[in-house]
A protein has these predicted regions:
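Terminal leader/tail segments of proteins
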Residues: 1-34, 38-185
């Protein structure tokens, strides 16, 4: 999951997004975690306003610690067009970080959904550095995948990588790299 700011102490759990209600900003609710402990509930109504972060009962001190931690992070540099070619820097706040995390988690979920749809319905493979699939062949309909994949390999003049044979996370990373045009990290 990519965000503008790299840190691992503050995360979100139980993210619920209402795409239909998202207008200017992402409409969501989530539990804010600090060092693995739930400390607050966050919500944004999706109308362009702020994200509200409210401490859970008895967690106000931890919420204050989390806010101090976020203030210690370097400012976020946004990629926006400016006349002076200077990067736009925004001081980190907890609500801004929560927005980043929610956006990144939601985008990752949507990507995972598209991947799961593709990997379940298509025979996806990498050949010559390109992501390809067999038209009209549904992966779910192949009874003996090992034999089918062996035959597919024998018909190729170059080695191929069949995504269905890889562990799910590895297949997702390769698929994502090709679909989004990302370079491997």
């Amino acid at each position: 999951m990519d965000t503008i700011t790299r840190q691992d102490r503050i995360t979100l759990k139980n993210l619920k997004v209402a795409d239909f209600a998202s207008e200017e900003t992402l409409c969501f609710t989530a539990t804010v975690m600090f060092d693995g402990r739930p400390i607050a509930e966050a919500r944004n109504d999706g109308h362009g306003g702020s994200t509200f972060v409210r401490a859970l009962q008895g967690q106000a001190a931890l919420l204050a610690q989390a806010e101090e931690f976020v203030k210690s992070l370097p400012p976020a540099s946004l990629d926006v067009e400016r006349e002076d070619d200077e990067p736009l820097l925004i001081d980190m706040t907890l609500d801004f970080l929560v927005d980043q995390l929610a956006d990144a988690m939601h985008a990752e979920r949507k990507l995972r959904t598209a991947f799961n749809r593709d990997i379940g319905n298509k025979v996806l493979f990498i050949k010559d550095g390109r992501l390809l699939f067999l038209k009209g062949i549904k992966l779910k309909a192949i009874a003996d995948r090992a034999a089918y994949f062996a035959k597919l390999r024998s018909r190729q003049d170059q080695p191929i990588v069949i995504l269905a044979e890889l562990p799910a996370d590895e297949a997702f990373a390769i698929w994502k790299q090709h679909v989004l045009g990302d370079k491997p990290r």
